């Protein structure tokens, strides 16, 4: 019902009652093996894979509405965390199927979450570390247990304050360098401060 199907959800039971997509459906990754093989045979470029759905925070606030989900992160944290972990479970399941299909030719795997505005974060660093960082860390750990591909993390906005967290949880490539987005527009500073630990892209 409506554009935010869990806008009125209040309980853990509401989350479990929602008809989540069937990630086991093989048609979701049916094209991946052949396309990866073709790109590998071409041999001119690194191969980047980007499975659908792998942005837990974005999916959560799409399901509830941004204002509602941000409020729930503060006033109903158990509910908000359950939503994030439910979505992350789907992300991991899809990622597993995708990596199985892609095989060892994959060079880079893209995940992410838009966490910034043009001049700051959407949530505080403390709230990120409490609620979202464990979700991202678990997904990245799963990826690295299944592939040698580098982890490419996309997040729009000024996310400068979270860069040490991204490095800690295993992000290899951070995207984008975004003109007009505060400290994320200063490539020289980014490279000087974090260039030994992170590749900046885009």
Residue ranges and their predicted role:
Residues 2-3, 7, 15-202:
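Active-site loop segments of alpha/beta catalytic cores
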């Amino acid at each position: 019902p409506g554009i935010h199907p869990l806008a009125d959800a209040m309980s853990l039971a509401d989350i479990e009652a929602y008809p989540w997509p069937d990630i086991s459906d093989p048609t979701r990754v049916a094209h991946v093996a052949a396309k990866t093989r073709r790109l590998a045979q071409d041999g001119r470029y690194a191969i980047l894979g980007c499975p659908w759905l792998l942005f837990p925070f974005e999916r959560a606030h799409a399901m509830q509405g941004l204002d509602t989900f941000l409020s729930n992160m503060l006033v109903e944290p158990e509910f908000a965390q359950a939503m994030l972990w439910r979505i992350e479970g789907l992300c991991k399941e899809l990622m597993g199927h995708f990596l199985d299909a892609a095989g060892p030719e994959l060079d880079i795997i893209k995940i992410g979450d838009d966490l910034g505005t043009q001049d700051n974060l959407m949530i505080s660093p403390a709230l990120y570390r409490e609620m979202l960082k464990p979700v991202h860390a678990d997904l990245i750990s799963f990826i690295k247990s299944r592939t040698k591909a580098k982890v490419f993390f996309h997040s729009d906005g000024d996310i400068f304050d979270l860069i040490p967290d991204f490095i800690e949880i295993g992000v290899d490539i951070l995207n984008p360098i975004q003109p007009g987005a505060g400290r994320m527009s200063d490539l020289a500073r980014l490279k000087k401060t974090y260039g030994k630990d992170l590749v900046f892209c885009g």
